[in-house]
Amino acid sequence: MAIRKRTYLSVLAGILCFIALGWWYGQFGRPVRDVYDDSAKKRIVYRMYADYKKEFPGVADISPKRALKLLRDNQILFVDTREPLEMRISMLPDAVARETFVSNPEKYPDKTVAAYCTISYRSGKFVEKMMKKGIRIYNLEGGILAWVLEGGKIYDADGETRRIHVYGKRWNYPATGYEPVW
């Protein structure tokens, strides 16, 4: 009798482990990013950004939707604050590297300037430093992740791309149809 009970408990424990692992890996083997639809990913990305924003509360934000409108009107300059490897995977339209902007911020007097990174934490810190120097610059709310989730396009050296550098597993929330890289 004790053996049957132990066998029963072992089988039950195995089933529970299987269920837990299935949940952990995102519905039985599917990557977590595929479990969520884009509206859920938006909520996650904007919630993460709101948490990060607490570290630079004085920084002015610009929403991806507002930035898209300014892009259509050719009135925005994007400053990519990510590392070169990330920028080689994809960038926002006509973005310049942080170093390029810092070397001559006066070069863009007629543009709204918006910095970004994966989720706009690093860019938020960058914007904070630039604001202390008297430079008017915004932080793209939610970064490149929110940008593609709101319908913005990204580019590599060959043109439009569906690859997006998400920095790491924690930020693996690309829009549907995008291939995450980290």
Predicted feature descriptions by range:
Residues A2-A60, R88-P109, G124-W182:
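Rhodanese-like catalytic fold shared by cysteine-dependent sulfurtransferases
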Residues K69-D73, P105-K111:
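Flexible, charged surface loops at secondary-structure boundaries
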Residues A67, Q75-R82:
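Short hydrophobic beta-strand that contains or immediately precedes a catalytic carboxylate
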Residues F56-R72:
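A short, well-structured juxtamembrane/interface segment
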Residues R82-P84, R88:
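Long amphipathic N-terminal alpha/beta scaffold segment
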Residues T118-R122:
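Gly/Ser/Thr-rich loops at beta-strand to alpha-helix junctions
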Residues I76, V113, I137-Y138:
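Hydrophobic anchor at the start of a short beta-strand
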